[in-house]
Design a protein with these regions (language model features):
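Hydrophobic alpha-helical segments
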Residues: 1-246
């Protein structure tokens, strides 16, 4: 299996670590953070910095809401949504580990620990391998993601809706890691980078432009007339003029 948790050592180990030596103990309380986005890291800032952080309550509330949608306490899978809570949290742990932000690793490891892992069938192992490899690559070297890699996710059983959710949660945890790293920096502490990981790609300014760019989906598009009621409601909320302009 790609993911392994060593209960005998009361700790966590994930296949993206370079070795099992020196892995950190699992803190079960890390899953119980009242603020599952900042994980209590803001409480250790001096009062002036803490007040500046909390002036951005709109952004923080939106981030917490995203967390709750992507990582609920319970989740039922269906024919069109096969990405289980185990899949989501194990992928989040992969992204947290390649980010090297220890509180984030502890949190997702603690949430993952009580869950039952998938069966050990060949198909399940292949699926977990593809999910883990894609999560790691998108989090560290996103420019290497190709259309065939997206097709491979579909080949191992992820629906288009699964793939969208999957890439969203990878992006969210990467964003969360950066916020926590900034908080650590404000406290004068560098994020603890685990050994054996490649450095994430830097962002190039030339990648941003105000010019009108052409865009095409790499996933099958959903026609408005065949969309579910929930999808139509979301479309009306975020783009009220989309139907009339299409």
């Amino acid at each position: 299996m790609e993911q392994q948790r060593k209960a005998a050592h009361s700790g966590w180990y994930h296949e993206t670590q370079s070795s099992q030596q020196g892995h950190l103990p699992l803190d079960p309380h890390a899953a119980l953070a009242q603020d599952r986005f900042l994980l209590g890291q803001d409480a250790q800032l001096d009062p002036t910095l803490r007040s500046l952080i909390h002036e951005r309550q709109g952004l923080l509330n939106a981030s917490r809401a995203c967390y709750d949608v992507l990582f609920p306490d319970s989740l039922k899978v269906s024919r069109t949504e096969t990405l289980s809570l185990y899949d989501r949290l194990s992928s989040a742990l992969t992204v947290a580990q390649v980010s090297g932000v220890q509180p984030l690793c502890s949190h997702y490891a603690a949430r993952l620990a009580p869950l039952s892992s998938p069966d050990a069938s060949r198909e399940s192992n292949i699926r977990q391998t593809h999910i883990t490899q894609f999560a790691r690559l998108l989090a560290t070297q996103p420019t290497l993601i190709t259309p065939p890699m997206l097709s491979q996710l579909n080949d191992v059983g992820l629906s288009t809706q699964d793939i969208v959710t999957f890439t969203q949660l990878i992006g969210f945890v990467s964003y969360q890691a950066r916020v926590l790293a900034i908080l650590n920096g404000l406290r004068g502490r560098a994020a603890a980078v685990l050994p054996g990981f490649p450095s994430p790609e830097g962002c190039e300014q030339k990648g941003y432009s105000l010019a009108m760019l052409q865009w095409s989906s790499r996933l099958p598009e959903v026609a408005p007339e065949s969309a579910s009621q929930h999808q139509q409601d979301v479309l009306d909320l975020i783009a009220p003029d989309a139907r009339s302009s299409s």
